[in-house]
Regions:
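Short, exposed coil/turn segments at beta-strand boundaries within extracellular/luminal domains
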Residues: 178-186, 290-297
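Hydrophilic extracytoplasmic domains
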Residues: 250-306
Length: 306
């Protein structure tokens, strides 16, 4: 259960990266016309400042930021591709945070908030399970785990697990049934599925390693591309940078952008593309301030040409 919880936390609240990051945007200007590629804005990620979530070989490499609202509801469809093999995970989650009960790391840095259970949660009339909410973080070079409470989950890996189906470009019905006949329910809008491929050019030894990322464009909104390094021996994924760009289907990552990342210390580089939709729900009888998002994610792992 601990390993599963660590994995799930990678996908719970990647949406908060848009809202909670402290951006210092830099533009990467390519040779493509504006019809093909927009300028890219990126934030580098400090391992000293970010929470880390390790889960082994199927990592999406997404870090978890401290939630900005007391309710976070997320539905995700995640594809993880390595060479010719693709695994598919579908999940729906709901976490209710007690913002009067912060959890801090050594030195007083905020790690997160304790969670609470407000009733019974269902997605598409499937009752979600209550599972541990675990956070992992790096402290003095070591990975430590902290239990923040419990949250609600439906999870399917390929065809194994809960019978939850994430339907793209559609809706997922959410319901929270509390005490005293109080309840909240609404539809969560889902985005068009994202599917990507990555072309590699050059190598680390020649200092000319670069990548071209192509995906099925939506022509509206933005996508996030997370770049991470994956260590097979340590079963650990470390995020390097978050890139934001218009959803036009093309992004080029030049060697000049990669030169400061410690790629030589990792076996694979991971590109995680996320397309998401936000659902507005102002206030219900139980749910007040909230973040509600559905996301389609494609995570591509590539052996690093040394």
């Amino acid at each position: 259960m601990k390993k599963l919880s660590a994995y799930i936390l990678i996908t719970l609240i990647p949406l908060l990266l848009f809202a909670c990051s402290k951006p210092l945007p830099t533009e990467l200007v390519g040779n493509e016309s504006s019809d093909e590629q927009s300028s890219l804005e990126f934030n580098t990620i400090s391992s000293d400042d970010e929470l880390l979530y390790k889960n082994g070989y199927d990592s999406t490499g997404t870090d978890l930021s401290v939630p900005s609202t007391s309710v976070v509801i997320s539905a995700s469809s995640i594809k993880t591709t390595y060479k010719s093999k693709t695994e598919v995970k579908e999940l729906a989650e709901a976490a209710f945070f007690d913002r009067e009960m912060p959890v801090k790391r050594q030195g007083g840095k905020l790690l997160g908030y304790r969670t609470k259970l407000l009733g019974v949660v269902s997605f598409n009339n499937l009752q979600a399970r209550v599972v541990p909410f675990m956070a992992s973080f790096r402290e003095h070079g070591a990975i430590k785990d902290t239990l923040l409470g419990s949250y609600f989950l439906l999870y399917k890996n390929n065809n194994s697990g809960d019978p939850f189906n994430f339907v793209h470009d559609s809706n997922i019905h959410f319901r929270l049934k509390g005490i005293m006949n109080r309840s909240d329910e609404f539809e969560i809008s889902t985005p068009k599925e994202i599917s990507a491929e990555v072309d590699v050019s050059g190598s680390l030894s020649n200092n000319d390693l670069s990548f071209k990322i192509k995906w099925d464009k939506a022509l509206q909104g933005k996508i996030q591309i997370l770049i991470s390094g994956l260590s097979i021996s340590q079963k650990n994924t470390v995020p390097f940078a978050k890139i934001y760009t218009d959803d036009k289907g093309l992004a080029k990552i030049p060697s000049s952008f990669l030169k400061d990342f410690p790629l030589a210390n990792f076996d694979r580089i991971v590109f995680t593309l996320s397309r998401r939709k936000t659902t507005e729900y102002k206030s219900g009888s139980i749910i007040k301030d909230n973040t509600i998002v559905a996301q389609t994610i494609h995570s591509i792992q590539l052996d690093i040409p040394k």
